[in-house]
Amino acid sequence: KAIEEYGVEDALLRLNGMFSCAVIDLKQSKLYLSTDYFGQKPLYLSTDSDLNIAFGSTGRLLIKDVDLNINLLNKRAINDFLTFGFVLPQHTVYKGIERLMPGSLFKVNLNDGTVYRNYEFQNQNYYLKNDLKEDFSSLLNKVMKDHLYSDFPVSIALSGGVDSTLIYGYL
């Protein structure tokens, strides 16, 4: 419904929570891939010179199903891991497979293969200092309700820190 009402890009801006998604707009002949702002639901993609695009929630899916010269390891990613102890968020250890950055939009024109990437796909909110306390409280209440909805029992690990104590207080 949101896509019908607002269009694909505006609807994606309005999404709140953990998500990664793919939308094909047949009227505009465009493919959209997008992830949540924190990258909690990752999305991996691979493209080749013939404009074949494969994507999935894990890089392993792309290794098995796509022959895009990914048998080679990404030496830069491996070097980053050995140097820094982690691989940069947009890279993977496989050559030819990348991870979409958190809060990003990847758009492909299916007619001509033009690719558009936006890593600042965020809705900026500016607050007055006086409104912060009230807005934070109502936002935290909403987020807690959204994230406590589960098919399984929910628990909290209390570390004694401010964040876990605050979350426990809102239960």
Stretches found by the model and what they are:
Residues 1-171:
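Cysteine-centered catalytic environments shared across enzyme families
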